[in-house]
Amino acid sequence: MYVRHLQVTDFRSWPHADLTFEPGPTVLVGSNGQGKTNLVEALGYVATLGSHRVATDAPLVRYGTQRAVVRAAVVNHGRELLVELEITPGKANRARINRGAAGKPRDVLGILRTVLFAPEDMAMVRGDPGERRRFLDDLLVARAPRYAGVRSDYDRVLRQRSALLKSAGAAKRGGSGGDLRTLEVWDGHLARYGAELLAGRLDLVAAIAPHVTSAYANVAATAEETAPSGRVADVRYRSSLGESLPEGYGVPRGEPADVEVLEKALLAELERVRAQELERGVSLVGPHRDDLELMLGELPAKGYASHGESWSFALALRLASYHLLAEDGAEPVLILDDVFAELDRRRRSRLAELVAGAEQVLVTAAVAEDVPEELTGVRFDVREGEVRRVE
């Protein structure tokens, strides 16, 4: 899979930009603030319908304009598809595939798969659980786009149920019972969608765990990171179900997670914590409270890993994602956004060795010399609102 062509209109800082790419490595070089990250962010948006930098679409539209348009021609196994996304904050976004209207924007998911390495990746290791949940869900949707709908349905039910908990809790404290029958209905919805999302995550963790272990061993830059026998990297799923989670779930398994079993477990745990939820006015159980534990030996990477080990783990998560998606039959486009400036020379070289053979690698850098020789292919200079190919 590779991107042959990218065109953006009023996206971020760009009134217009038009780039033609080739398979292999491509480097976009420009000083900070010139807009090179905005270009690869546009490709990430085509792949995920979201940005790795902001949570809403509004900042993606150039100041003073009403909408942004991103077009990408993607080649996969010899077949080219043209994806067009029209981003209009406050309104429904529109999507086209080969110039024909798509039913919903998420119909384009799966046409382009990307794995993006960025300085923000350190938050996956050192940040809040939400960062790791997002990592899991984005990868889950990349592998199986239908999970975009599951996640959307779960988020919608969670908002409705949480609002009901607040009102029912206030009514109970005021002396009335509140409508608990309605709450039971929302319990059922939350358990149904939550079980689907949870099953997908559990299966994903089981699939990616061996890739994380091997990727960490490959990318670790110093002997101190890999020599001690207890410093093997691993990932484990920690569920808010606690002891209600069936035995064996949360660790790599040899069989798919059972949605019905998980739904029953969620319903049982919701009933158990009902009084606490009414008291606090929040939903205490479900995938939104879960975490992906990143382990180095028997210790969690968060809080115990050094700065170098944390970077190695972040890179390992992205490399593992790449290998997992490639196993599925469609090698993703690799995007390395200002990553080499964050890495020491050893990690730069090792990462370049590991990704140089990918079908397409797009690299952004402020200084061309930061990019290892293995990835110095086609070069574009990004300067003063223009993109120029360097021959």
Swiss-Prot record:
SUPFAM superfamilies: P-loop containing nucleoside triphosphate hydrolases. GO terms for biological process: DNA replication; DNA synthesis involved in DNA repair; double-strand break repair; SOS response. It is found in: Cytoplasm. Transmembrane segments: none annotated. One of its GO terms (molecular function) is single-stranded DNA binding. Its main location: cytoplasm. Pfam families: SMC_N. Gene3D superfamilies: P-loop containing nucleotide triphosphate hydrolases, RecF/RecN/SMC, N-terminal domain. Keywords: ATP-binding, Cytoplasm, DNA damage, DNA repair, DNA replication, DNA-binding, Nucleotide-binding, SOS response. It comes from the Bacteria. InterPro entries: DNA-binding_RecF (IPR001238), DNA-binding_RecF_CS (IPR018078), P-loop_NTPase (IPR027417), RecF/RecN/SMC_N (IPR003395), RecF_2 (IPR042174). GO terms for cellular component: cytoplasm. ATP binds at residues 30-37. Belongs to the RecF family. The RecF protein is involved in DNA metabolism; it is required for DNA replication and normal SOS inducibility. RecF binds preferentially to single-stranded, linear DNA. It also seems to bind ATP. This is DNA replication and repair protein RecF. It comes from Saccharopolyspora erythraea (strain ATCC 11635 / DSM 40517 / JCM 4748 / NBRC 13426 / NCIMB 8594 / NRRL 2338). The lineage of its organism: Bacteria, Bacillati, Actinomycetota, Actinomycetes, Pseudonocardiales.
